Amino acid sequence: MPGITETSQVTGPVLAHVIVTEDPYDASERAFLSTDLYELLFEDYANGSKSGLTLISIQLMGSSLFNEFQTFKVYESEEQLPPNTVNLCNMGNIIDYSSDFTVDSGYVARVDSLVKLDTVIISVLPEVYSLASQASQHQLVDILGGNDQHTVIRQGDYNKDINGKISLCEPTDQGFLESTTKIIVVKENSLNLPLLDQSQDGSLNYEENVKMNLEHSISNYFSLNSLDPENQITTTGVEFSVKCLDSPISVRKTAKSISVAHDSEDESSPKLVEEDISNEDTLLYAFCKTTELAKIGCLSGDIVKMKSGQCQCTTFECNCESCPVQYRYIRIHAFTDPNTYEKGCIYLNPILSFNLNNPKIVKLCPISIPDKRFELQGFHFSKFIPLAKQVTIARVSSPVTLDRTLQTLFLTNLKTYFESGRKVLSKDQLIPIPVDTLLAKSIFSTYEKLGVDDSQFPTVIPEGKPDAIAWFKVTEVSGELADSASQQFIIDPLKTKMMQSGVVSCSPPKNSQHCNWANYLGCGQMFSFPNVSGVTTSTFEYAKTLRKLIKATIDPSRLVNLQTTVLLSSLSRAIGKSLLVHSLALECGVHLVEIDGYEVLNPSSESKTIGTIRGKLDRVVEGCTPLIVFIKHIEALTKKSEQQQKDSLAVKINELIDEYTAKPGVLFVASTNDSDNLSDELRAKFKFEIVLGVPSEQERTLIFKYLIDFDQKTTPKVTEGTRELSFAPRNDLSLSSLSLQSAGLTPRDLISIVENAKTLAVDRVESLAKHHNVSFENMVYSSGGYIKFTPEDVEKSINTARNKFSDSIGAPRIPNVKWEDVGGLDVVKDEILDTIDMPMKHPELFSNGIKKRSGILFYGPPGTGKTLLAKAIATNFALNFFSVKGPELLNMYIGESEANVRKVFQRARDAKPCVVFFDELDSVAPKRGNQGDSGGVMDRIVSQLLAELDGMSGGDGGDGVFVVGATNRPDLLDEALLRPGRFDKMLYLGVSDTHEKQSKIMEALSRKFHLHPSVDLDKVAESCPFTFTGADFYALCSDAMLNAMTRIANTVDEKIKRYNEELPEKSQVSTRWWFDNVATKEDIDVLVTLEDFDKSRKELVPSVSAEELDHYLRVRQNFEGGKEKKVVQENGQTEHFSNGSANNHITFGDEQVVEAIDENGNSIIA
């Protein structure tokens, strides 16, 4: 690596060599810089103009385990170090890897200051926790290094003094430990530490361990040196499982090919010669763990043979017919250690993998040429792969390659692809060319308006951000083939004649999680809609259905053309219908052409609309297979009309659908936000209709995981002198908590939440940097080089999204009413726990069809806390809350009222776990047949409500949805509502019948008051009658607070009056000035006294009279056992049964009859 030549001071990242050492005499962590690097980063310290503590932040390169910047103290510059070098001494987390550490470079940046840590959370094992938890805060700080004034604590480090892992640091991931830092010790069963090399007795002996591993590694590698003529390699190959890389891995270009040449003076002794391989085809680079190289018998950077069959067998020696074994020459590299890659696996780039038909297993063999090894002039691909004389490349027919507006850009990119190096190709190989479609269309439209011919388009085009792939296929390649099994040719742009002609039809490669070529080529990672099985349901069932339809349609083994047509619909916008089609098209390896109904619609002419559609689709449908024709917003073309006449445009579109789907392998998909507005003629044409709902809790968890992991996988690269701003979640961010709080939101809302959380995180870091007088850049380095968004940032973002879009999307919110706000209803609370807690904690008990009791009816006098209790249920169980009033459901149009009921329950299912609260239920579901409304709208609402309640009690559809009703008149309700399975648990909420309960209610209502020490709520309760409801006590406490405020205000007015009397008339002060300058704490502190409560109680009139309470008690007896029925038995005795629920069989002759006595004494015989 070249040394540093610049002399000006820089603060941005600088690429430098890294060495790791261990000092047996001084265990403190520290870093040393070479003299030139120290002068570059700390010029003001080097020339003596500044002194004090110096810090650096370094990100080690090459290993995925060191993807964050870590801050270290710099003791001094070291002249003995080579130029541009950092020496990390006693870095415990690095030393622990022993000989498995091969990182030798990293980006180094200057850090001027760190933040003082407020809190440090340490995770320890259970056997250590009992001892660590007993230590005082002062002892814990001393153990962590509190004696040192500038001890740097880093999140994720393992501290050997306390045998624990630093799990979390606040306010930043790295900072100074102070005596005031709060240390919290928590118990963890596993600390997720790196695998350490241990001696047989389990202790760590670093010196012996490093020495032993180093000697073993050196001897092992020299014995495997492919340049050693004495080494006779007899291996026939090693089998490896195949995995694909997620993103390109850069190979150091200083690693030139090591070749062997003879010394002119002594021909018998070979010497090493470096030859440039920077223009090689990197798609032939494969990677594995360092330990796997010993099995193959090669070094990192050697060329080996990779044999593979063309089947999907899991064993290499298969007996498949038409499966000739072929091999490729590849260059094998070892991953930088330490890493998390699997053993026994070879990692290929996805392009090479799908061109080999995605083999599951390959065999790697070292190249062995007996007696001619030292006649080779270099291990270049050109020594094994011949040069192609001529190559013919054809376009793969696809919507991208057939689009004229994109042609200039992808042909330019194709030329750049071959000019960038010596590519290696074989016949029938697919070549992907990334294209930025937005950039291409902009260039085309700009130059087309200027009247410029295609040949005059610019030859140098910006790279852009690719979002599509233009595929090309090698149809012919000619040259002197040295090995028929390889079929590889080198393409030299200066020597090989290249031709691009013709169009071929074939399917694109399948993009899967195991072979994600789209992400590898920079097109971004698309959400895959995984089908994960849960306790009762699976995630993204609609994606599973569409996936099956696509695979069945494109299956070449089917003899019958299915002519599949699918309509995707949703009740809400931004559900992800278009994303679903794009994702499954990539996954299944199908071409996709998409048009927007609003863009092709010509309201004035149906023929022009059809002509526009044909102009966009005819050529694509004719030339591409398999293909998905996707029209979004299809409702724009044919809307349902009130008239009973046929829609001529819908008829023509139906003819187009028949024409397109008549071709095998073509699938027609359309999407709409409201399928009911689609014309009946067109809707009837679709054989399958798939409804996309709002994501469930488990689905939202997967979406959040995708959004957050996606950001980490696309972390911007650090380049010398610059570092792009990147984001990452903090360790304590809980996806399950986020998914619970975001109930009812669409995927687009979830994306907005994550983006807003990033903005809030930036604002928080800027505010923190200003508060601690630290630069923003240093704050970012303190967090590992990322802007970390915290759970608080995401929760604020969720609340902002709900407040902003609650009216438009109807998003439910969790109310903030706790059990402490509800007083005197302990018995009712227990009943609620039995009804709601069991289905939520043990849903598996109801997965086999067992019906759960999900309906609760609160009834009783007004003001007894029915609505408050329903909100407390939602808060206590973290449920979303829907409140439904009767007038909200009524609509003047026939059928719309019932549709409103259906929408309420559908929204509840989308937002589950959820509570649907029907306030004043008697106005929503009165007895059927008693209303005189025209059309019987109330009867239909009740019938629809009964049907929805039956769906809620089932084991599948209503999982996580609970229905709560409240009414003052249960005698007016339809009897069908009160049967088991609907509102089957009736809870009476009456007035408090003891002074103790009354005291608990006032305690709950006044828990935020400042009460005078003389106030005894028990005494206040003893003076209250038993006719006071909860609302009356609320009025009592509110009036008492108002009396106290009035009393304080009058006292303040008197004080201001006396104060002004002592001043001259012209110097009178205002009330505001007096509060700002004269008032004391006693003047603004409102203390509620016993006199305030007495005055409020004397003025309060009960809202429910004693006679009304007696009426409600009679109603309660009616519903909870007051209807005792007498059953006459054969022996003449009478038994009492509640609600007539039990009858007795009586025998008269040979017949059995049932006789019951109703409450009026009448005999009933059935």
UniProtKB/Swiss-Prot annotation:
Catalytic activity: ATP + H2O = ADP + phosphate + H(+)
Record's keyword terms, sorted: ATP-binding, Hydrolase, Membrane, Nucleotide-binding, Peroxisome biogenesis
SMART domains: AAA
UniProt-listed InterPro entries: AAA+_ATPase (IPR003593), AAA_ATPase_domain (IPR050168), ATPase_AAA_core (IPR003959), ATPase_AAA_CS (IPR003960), P-loop_NTPase (IPR027417), PEX6_4th_dom (IPR056995), RecA-like_PEX6_r2 (IPR047533)
One GO cellular component, as annotated: cytosol
Effect of deleting the gene: Leads to a peroxisomal-deficient phenotype with the absence of peroxisomes and the accumulation of aberrant peroxisomal structures resembling 'membranous ghosts'.
SUPFAM superfamilies reported in the protein's UniProt record: P-loop containing nucleoside triphosphate hydrolases
CDD domains referenced in this protein's UniProt entry, alphabetically: RecA-like_PEX6_r2
One GO term of the biological process aspect: protein unfolding
Molecular function as annotated in GO: ATP binding; ATP hydrolysis activity; protein transporter activity
Membrane topology: Peripheral membrane protein
Subcellular location: Membrane
Enzyme class of the recorded protein, top EC level: hydrolase
Coiled coil location: none
Pfam families: AAA (PF00004), PEX6_4th (PF23315)
Enzyme Commission designation: 3.6.4.-
Family: Belongs to the AAA ATPase family.
UniProt subunit comment: Interacts with PEX1; forming the PEX1-PEX6 AAA ATPase complex, which is composed of a heterohexamer formed by a trimer of PEX1-PEX6 dimers.
Function description: Component of the PEX1-PEX6 AAA ATPase complex involved in peroxisome biosynthesis. The complex acts as a protein dislocase complex that mediates the ATP-dependent extraction of the PEX5 receptor from peroxisomal membranes, an essential step for PEX5 recycling. Specifically recognizes PEX5 monoubiquitinated at 'Cys-6', and pulls it out of the peroxisome lumen through the PEX2-PEX10-PEX12 retrotranslocation channel. Extraction by the PEX1-PEX6 AAA ATPase complex is accompanied by unfolding of the TPR repeats and release of bound cargo from PEX5.
Protein's name according to its UniProt entry: Peroxisomal ATPase PEX6
Species the sequence originates in: Komagataella phaffii (strain GS115 / ATCC 20864) (Yeast)
Name of encoding gene: PEX6
